[in-house]
Amino acid sequence: MSQKMDFDAIVIGGGFGGLYAVKKLRDELELKVQAFDKATDVAGTWYWNRYPGALTDTETHLYCYSWDKELLQSLEIKKKYVQGPDVRKYLQQVAEKHDLKKSYQFNTAVQSAHYNEADALWEVTTEYGDKYTARFLITALGLLSAPNLPNIKGINQFKGELHHTSRWPDDVSFEGKRVGVIGTGSTGVQVITAVAPLAKHLTVFQRSAQYSVPIGNDPLSEEDVKKIKDNYDKSLGWCMNSALAFALNESTVPAMSVSAEERKAVFEKAWQTGGGFRFMFETFGDIATNMEANIEAQNFIKGKIAEIVKDPAIAQKLMPQDLYAKRPLCDSGYYNTFNRDNVRLEDVKANPIVEITENGVKLENGDFVELDMLICATGFDAVDGNYVRMDIQGKNGLAMKDYWKEGPSSYMGVTVNNYPNMFMVLGPNGPFTNLPPSIESQVEWISDTIQYTVENNVESIEATKEAEEQWTQTCANIAEMTLFPKAQSWIFGANIPGKKNTVYFYLGGLKEYRTCASNCKNHAYEGFDIQLQRSDIKQPANA
């Protein structure tokens, strides 16, 4: 018996991707859309990540949508980089201005999404058991939104305050407390720097030392802000037509083509200017691809660590042993933090955590660190984490967690073979860039594709196995041209025990990605299996 179609499209997620998908499909294609988010409000990843020090590493005026020119002009810009509360405020403004919340059911986690081949519908079930159907499923589940909780003996018996940075409660006080932080990645660097001046004592449990450069989060003058707003179109166009979408001068100069003195001067200027992506990509064009160039960048940052950190033994612990080939970090005084009398650094690679007890952390050498609060800045099961945790089933009941057992695959980071009419925003093997421009690019491609299916009486559209395999191999080939796979990083899944170390991003840049997506569309969706509408199948509302 044929099922009733409740909606044309169901959108999962209330962040940058989900909000824009709702707007495009509902307001421009005039489809009947229902969206869900487990949070109480919009903002996606930024709704959950409320830890102290939360900050983008993208300049404020570029961490936004390009399509709402009016809102761009009214945007309150105070500093070069935008803090978490201001990201939430901005997305609230977008949602309210465009009345997007009326399409959302908040406080509602989607438990399962199953594809019904007989009716060519997605059947979505919420945590409350409510069931809905739709022709199209858009998953904007978040790149960094599936928390990675450390698997440490005894962690659940800790009787002090235990927090993961991605599930941060309101009104946490550090006053008079002995605080421990596990993790020194991008989140750890931010929270450590913010908490150190507030806590009675802070112990940092470091597994891997990190390369980090100053963020340079300077206040902006009225003249600076006016210049930014007068040049929005140029800056945002620059993003869309660049590799990284950060509107920076992506260098093509080889590091070893200049003298040692000039190289040091270029690095020093970047250090003083601030910004992780600027340091890695605006200084020289081969830091991420040439070992000799990479070592020069490593040595410069290590020299800065030695200059900044007063205790040579602590400075040595903070010296990274890996390549400078992870997502580049930046900070607001991270290395200086270890000059404070109330901060202790524990190298848990050399002296592992044995157990967490009711009141602290026991180390292998017998030391015991008493704590009132333990913060897990241990990151995320990134990119595919939320997909394999959700019950998503495609054709023939194929579970996505099984299909991706040996590592995720996709066509352009948007579609997956065996999962017709399902479109991902920031899915595996999408572009590695400043995220809002990539999100816009993908959502617009998804919207155009759905419009094509409606106008051409298409029942289902699905990436072919060949196109998916070719794209995944392309991503792997490009990654192998860089040094990134040689470093232990979350961008290849190395932060999750047991997770296959594989490619999770397209490293060819946003400009080339947009060209690939455009070529696919302009060549009648080459790489897709397209099935025309059957007479007994209900069509979308505006068909």
From Swiss-Prot:
For activity, the cofactor(s) needed are:
FAD
| Top-level lineage group | Bacteria
Carries keyword Flavoprotein?
Answer: yes
Per UniProt, what is one Pfam family of this protein?
A: FMO-like
Q: Does the keyword NADP apply?
A: yes
Positions that bind FAD: F16, D37, W46, D57, Y63, V110
Alphabetized UniProt keyword annotations: Aromatic hydrocarbons catabolism, FAD, Flavoprotein, Monooxygenase, NADP, Oxidoreductase
Q: Where is this site: Transition state stabilizer?
A: R327
Instruction: Please provide, alphabetically and separated by semicolons, the GO molecular function terms listed in this UniProt record.
Output: cyclohexanone monooxygenase activity; flavin adenine dinucleotide binding; N,N-dimethylaniline monooxygenase activity; NADP binding
Q: Which GO terms describe its biological process?
A: catabolic process
How would you classify this enzyme at the top EC level? oxidoreductase
EC assignment: the record states: 1.14.13.22
Reactions catalysed: cyclohexanone + NADPH + O2 + H(+) = hexano-6-lactone + NADP(+) + H2O
Similarity-based family: Belongs to the FAD-binding monooxygenase family.
Protein name stated in the entry: Cyclohexanone 1,2-monooxygenase
**Protein species of origin:** Acinetobacter sp
